[in-house]
Amino acid sequence: MAKKVNAYIKLQVKAGQANPSPPVGPALGQHGVNIMEFCKAFNAKTQNLEPGLPTPVVITVYSDRSFTFITKTPPASVLLRKAAGIKSGSGRPNTEKVGTVNRAQLEEIANVKMPDLSAGSLDAAVRTIAGTARSMGLNVEE
């Protein structure tokens, strides 16, 4: 018989830098999960990613206090900011442009994000990422 699921916890944790301090500790502690066990497993799984890159993770907590987790790809906005070399997006994206990204950068980001996107092709994924870039106030060069 399958284990009974108690909770799903969604967090964004910096790759390779999970520790028991907030937000990880309180979120896992209230469900009785061994926090250090999660931190060690998460850090081991994300060691090949760039350290400090925010990584979404979905933790499934079972009734016997065991857990499994799935890491996702970093948010498109973080990857776009890194590609454009900016600190934050524009407060007024339609009037105030803060940077530029080209097609090659969009394709690179789309390749990274492809497992988490519902796009059927790379071209559709690039268009999705380009829309995110425009909404952040970035110029998109074709």
Swiss-Prot record:
Output the PTM entry: One or more lysine residues are methylated.
Per its UniProt record, what InterPro entries does this chain match? Ribosomal_uL11, Ribosomal_uL11_bac-typ, Ribosomal_uL11_C, Ribosomal_uL11_C_sf, Ribosomal_uL11_N, Ribosomal_uL11_N_sf
GO CC annotations on file: cytosolic large ribosomal subunit
* Entry-linked SUPFAM superfamilies: Ribosomal L11/L12e N-terminal domain, Ribosomal protein L11, C-terminal domain
- Keywords recorded for this protein, A-Z: Methylation, Ribonucleoprotein, Ribosomal protein, RNA-binding, rRNA-binding
Acyltransferase listed as a keyword: no
Cross-referenced PROSITE patterns, in alphabetical order? RIBOSOMAL_L11
Give the Gene Ontology MF terms in alphabetical order.
large ribosomal subunit rRNA binding; structural constituent of ribosome
Give the record's subunit note. Part of the ribosomal stalk of the 50S ribosomal subunit. Interacts with L10 and the large rRNA to form the base of the stalk. L10 forms an elongated spine to which L12 dimers bind in a sequential fashion forming a multimeric L10(L12)X complex.
HAMAP family annotated for this entry? Ribosomal_uL11
User: What family does the database annotate?
Assistant: Belongs to the universal ribosomal protein uL11 family.
Q: What is this protein called?
A: Large ribosomal subunit protein uL11
Q: Which organism is it from?
A: Hahella chejuensis (strain KCTC 2396)
Q: According to the entry, what is the taxonomic lineage of the organism? A: Bacteria, Pseudomonadati, Pseudomonadota, Gammaproteobacteria, Oceanospirillales
Q: Give the gene name.
A: rplK
